[in-house]
């Protein structure tokens, strides 16, 4: 029995299916054969393109599989069987994961977003999904780039500064941090 990714993800930060074995048929949207990820992202065929509400479940998920990362490519239709788990606040399918190529999946679309969701719940609705920012963003943090492939983005053309980068410790720095949280 196939389980849709949205059911695996659920509408809360933690999957309702943790420690359960699932099988799902989806489209590969990213592969990470090097750099420590050792896996792929998959998304429900035909999904994407429409913005989600914070209460919606995501249609994408990470699959921890060294074999898959080296043998499938973006756009492939795959059957994935493995165990649902949470890893550093990320829902993934892992364990003794089985990934097989197949045919017949409708392509996925990137969901265009003028602004990225500001809340954890808003971002959770897009966890693991293909998104396409459509407005201007500035890289504001690259600390996790080499290890995790992550960059921090800020809306507009101004990076977010740490309070003490632009003000002395105390009220001035605190005001900068308050302004950052409001963005």
Locations of the language-model features?
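Extended non-catalytic accessory segments flanking core domains
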Residues: 1-183
């Amino acid at each position: 029995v196939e389980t849709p990714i949205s059911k695996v993800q659920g509408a809360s930060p933690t999957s309702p299916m943790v420690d359960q074995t699932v099988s799902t048929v989806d489209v590969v949207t990213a592969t990470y054969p090097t750099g420590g990820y050792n896996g792929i992202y998959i998304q429900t065929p035909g999904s994407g393109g429409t913005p989600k509400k914070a209460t919606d479940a995501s249609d994408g998920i990470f699959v921890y599989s060294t074999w898959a990362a080296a043998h499938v490519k973006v756009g492939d239709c795959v059957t994935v069987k493995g165990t649902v788990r949470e890893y550093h606040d990320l829902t993934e399918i892992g364990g003794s994961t089985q990934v097989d190529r197949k045919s017949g999946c409708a392509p996925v679309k990137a969901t265009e977003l003028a602004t990225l969701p500001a809340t954890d719940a808003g971002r959770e609705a897009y966890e693991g999904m293909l998104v396409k920012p459509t407005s201007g963003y500035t890289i504001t943090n690259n600390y996790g780039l080499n290890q995790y492939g992550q960059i921090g983005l800020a809306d507009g053309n101004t990076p977010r500064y740490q309070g003490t980068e632009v003000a002395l410790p105390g009220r001035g720095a605190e005001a900068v941090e308050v302004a950052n949280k409001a963005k």
